[in-house]
Amino acid sequence: MAIQRLSNSAPALAPKGTGLLEYQLVMQMKGRTVKRIAAAVALILLASALVGCRGMSDKYSKYSDSLFDVFNTLITVVAYTPSEKEFDSHFATMRERFRKLHQLYDIYNDYQGINNVKTINDHAGVQPVKVDREIIDLLLFAKDWYRRTGGKTNVAMGAVLQIWHDYREQGQSDPENAKLPPMEDLREAEKHTDIDKVIIDAENSTVYLADPEMSLDVGAVAKGYATEIVAREMAEAGLKSAVISSGGNIRAIGKPLDGVRERWGVGIQNPDESIVPDEQNVLDVIFINDASVASSGDYMRYYVVNGRVLHHIIDPATLMPADYYRAVTVMTAHAGVADFLSTTLFLLPYEQSRALAQSLDGVEAAWVMPDGEVKATDGMKAIMRSQGA
């Protein structure tokens, strides 16, 4: 059966993974090459960039390493440091911070001695839960941006998203019997998504869900927010040149100190091209320093029902996967904002989506339309290779 998307005007889908498409990642480290099966993402670090003056390359060497066990994705760090020992020290710190933040923001698993987002969900309607300040800050951040952007991305939509998660898991494990969630179940769950019932007591560091049937799902923001925390801490610790790639999020620290490039090149993956991420199958390249890029797309987590691809980005207005675009990419300073906005813009019709992006200072965006056309804000065009950057 031919696979078609929810939008009748969309092209047929090429075979895709979970938004984390398999490829062989070859990481060059000083004196050795490590080959790993890793996960490709919508954004790809590229070798191409503007050429600058040489000089720093004599002082800095390139190192990289990856994490496979946090935030359900591959996290890769590429950095230029004076020595491998210094890189290893920075990476060890980043690894521990990502693991701690993963445990705090996890909605599926318990950890001994930790009250996390799952703990909050487990106590919905029962009592406030005392949590780490980093959970308080994440939820305040998400509520603030929810209100600033019209309420499309709602961390209180856990009841609805859990239904989709369960049906997607079942559909992926047993494709022949994959089903749509019943709309009556989704509408019943929708009654329990009022973000105002997420009661945050910042002074006492507690969170209480006033509706016993509601739950939090921070998947649209947690990974980017955690990436921003780690990037800022590493810059403060003296890391001058690095890129952190976490799923569909990329955060650059400084510029590449290789004596060749003045900016990092980030490729926007073509959803319908080869699963091997290289410069031959990207839609475009954007160039950044000290900035973040995030993408949300319909080719990430999904399953198929009767030939229809059902991805994981659910429109709160319809309770169904949004079908305005193939992907949306956002560039801004803060990785958490980029992560949040890439989802929000994906959930809005183009004119509203573009108007929102243009109303926010320091935010640029690109939209991959169902027919493959790429539209972009003027500021995004200024840093896109196809536009002469």
Task: Provide a role label for each language-model segment.
Residues 3-9, 15-389:
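Mature catalytic core of soluble alpha/beta enzymes
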